Amino acid sequence: TTCCPSIVARSNFNVCRLPGTPEALCATYTGCIIIPGATCPGDYAN
């Protein structure tokens, strides 16, 4: 599960992923995090 701190970060993450960029790279670039579970922490609710 990818969790982002804002809607803007989520949008940027989604655009980053469009050409097939690895999830981990896009998460680092946008400030999002990748977690093993299904529930994002409160400060990464997007």
UniProtKB/Swiss-Prot annotation:
<feature type="disulfide bond">
    <location>
        <begin position="3"/>
        <end position="40"/>
    </location>
</feature>
<keyword id="KW-1015">Disulfide bond</keyword>
<feature type="disulfide bond">
    <location>
        <begin position="4"/>
        <end position="32"/>
    </location>
</feature>
<dbReference type="InterPro" id="IPR036391">
    <property type="entry name" value="Thionin-like_sf"/>
</dbReference>
<dbReference type="Pfam" id="PF00321">
    <property type="entry name" value="Thionin"/>
</dbReference>
<feature type="disulfide bond">
    <location>
        <begin position="16"/>
        <end position="26"/>
    </location>
</feature>
<keyword id="KW-0964">Secreted</keyword>
<protein>
    <recommendedName>
        <fullName>Crambin</fullName>
    </recommendedName>
</protein>
<comment type="similarity">
    <text>Belongs to the plant thionin (TC 1.C.44) family.</text>
</comment>
<dbReference type="GO" id="GO:0006952">
    <property type="term" value="P:defense response"/>
</dbReference>
<dbReference type="InterPro" id="IPR001010">
    <property type="entry name" value="Thionin"/>
</dbReference>
<comment type="function">
    <text>The function of this hydrophobic plant seed protein is not known.</text>
</comment>
<keyword id="KW-0611">Plant defense</keyword>
<dbReference type="GO" id="GO:0005576">
    <property type="term" value="C:extracellular region"/>
</dbReference>
